[in-house]
Curated annotation (Swiss-Prot):
This is UPF0210 protein CPF_1748. Belongs to the UPF0210 family. PANTHER family: UPF0210 PROTEIN MJ1665 (PTHR37560:SF1), UPF0210 PROTEIN SPR0218 (PTHR37560). Signal peptide: none annotated. It comes from the Bacteria. Transmembrane segments: none annotated. Homodimer. InterPro entries: UPF0210.
Length: 450
């Protein structure tokens, strides 16, 4: 039987602590759309998305009304387009990106992901076409998101892809306002197939025809819970986070199952990730400071983040029948009011953020850098982050934005959930010769598990 204090606690979480479901994401296979004619393929993709997802937004809104749970985004992820379009006789996949954009707008979702390629061991002709299509595709669409997987623990790092993605990010930044196209482009190592979060979501080839995946949020709830155990031992801190994570994830499980039932689409996973927003009271950085840090980014931050990330997973695992996606704590600089502030104050640097990515979900996320940064430096940042993922057998990623005509200390405004970001310093050295070597960095010895 529900107790009054539990009901009041839930209401407080939603009304005062910014508890929400960050996204309901429909994963959709486009394998049956394959066609040699890119125009026909684009039409098939549009038709399948609009037919399958026609009730996605309404379903989310109905669940919001029924349970009183805010659902911030409704999204779609599709099979990596480099696979779907492999038989096309064309030089660019811009028409496909436009069809995805049009279909997503037609059904009313916030973003659609899957304009993607998996090149961790090498390129197919289709992979190269897609990557070369990225700048113009991101410049000519509004809500299409893209990702490229350039490495894995099993196969090493494709350094040719790392070099190419540095050049692609640089080019994209030059043809989109304030480099905004780069905010819709993620470079992965060890990408997962069931990620509900953008911009890195795609529907993996091992997935079902269609699934419902849900991503939860709630850093504000965790911070409020930690306020009750100030000065207590780390054991109590971990226990508090675990109990809170259970409650947050349980809500995500409820929404996922309900959406699955209403749409008659199988339930996939709940992603346990704590995802911040620029709103005050919805910050992962403030959770870390609540543990006893004067500033997020000071010494001790990596340890605090490791504790948070692990406790969130342990608590959430019991609350859902299927946990997947990225499942950890996100540290997107422009989307977290605390991290924005501490970046301005000099406590958070790219080097410190890189250390933090060793122990949390994903990687260097929504970081703005000077527009004059070279393509090889961007490739070097990608290579460093991919190495962390490869060696530690975890997902890492880079979503970095070179902002034209901006330099260290300037501010760029992206708006909405993407927030704003100070332009951060990159190393003045260069890695041109290193990046130009080409080939693959071999997989680590512990990849040989058979």
């Amino acid at each position: 039987m529900l107790k009054n204090n539990e009901i009041l606690e839930t209401i407080s979480m939603i009304k005062e602590q910014n508890l929400d479901v960050r996204t309901i994401t429909l994963g959709l296979s486009l394998m049956d759309c394959a066609c040699e004619d890119v125009k026909v393929l684009s039409e098939k993709i549009y038709d399948k998305i609009t037919k399958t997802a026609e009730n996605l937004v309404k379903t989310g809104e109905d669940i919001e009304k029924r349970f009183g749970i805010p659902i911030i985004n409704k999204r779609i992820s599709v099979t990596p387009i480099s696979i779907v379009a492999a038989s096309c006789n064309c030089n660019s996949y811009l028409d496909i990106a436009k069809a995805m954009d049009k279909a997503a707008k037609e059904v009313g979702v916030d973003f659609i992901g899957g304009f993607s390629a998996l090149v961790h061991k090498g390129f197919t002709n289709s992979d190269l076409k897609l990557i070369k299509s990225l700048p113009e595709s991101l410049a000519n669409t509004d809500i299409v998101c893209s990702s490229v997987n350039i490495g894995s623990t099993r196969y090493g790092i494709n350094m040719d892809a790392v070099k190419l993605m540095g050049e692609t990010i640089k080019e994209t930044s030059l043809i989109t306002p304030d480099g905004f196209g780069c905010a819709k482009l993620v470079v992965f190592c060890n990408a997962v197939e069931d990620n509900p979060f953008m911009a890195g979501a795609f529907h993996g080839v091992g997935e079902a025809e269609k699934v419902i995946n849900v991503g939860v949020s709630g850093p504000g709830v965790v911070k409020k819970a930690l306020e009750e155990v100030r000065g207590k031992s780390f054991e109590e801190v971990a226990e508090t986070i675990k109990k809170t994570s259970f409650k947050v994830t349980r809500m995500g499980q409820l929404v996922a199952k309900e959406a699955s039932k209403l749409m008659d689409i199988p339930f996939g996973i709940v992603d346990l990730s704590l995802a911040p927003t620029p709103a005050v009271g919805d910050s992962v950085g403030r959770v870390l400071e609540e543990m006893g840090l004067s500033n997020c980014g000071t010494h001790g931050t990596t340890a605090a983040l490791a504790l948070l990330n692990d406790a969130v997973k342990k608590g959430g695992l019991m609350a859902s029948s299927y946990v997947g996606g990225l499942s950890g704590a996100f540290i997107p600089v422009s989307e977290d009011e605390c991290m924005i502030e501490q970046s301005k104050n000099g406590f958070l640097t790219i080097e410190k953020l890189e250390a933090m990515t060793c122990v949390c979900s994903v990687g260097l996320d929504m970081i703005a850098i000077p527009g004059k940064t070279s393509a090889s430096t961007i490739s070097g940042i990608i290579a460093d982050e991919a190495a962390i993922g490869m060696i530690n057998n975890k997902t890492t990623a880079v979503r970095i934005i070179p902002v034209p005509n901006k330099d260290i200390g300037d501010i760029v405004e992206f708006g909405g959930l993407l927030g704003s970001a100070p332009i951060m310093r990159v190393s003045p050295g260069n890695c041109d010769d290193f990046i130009s070597r080409g080939g693959r960095i071999p997989a680590p010895v512990h990849s040989l598990k058979n």
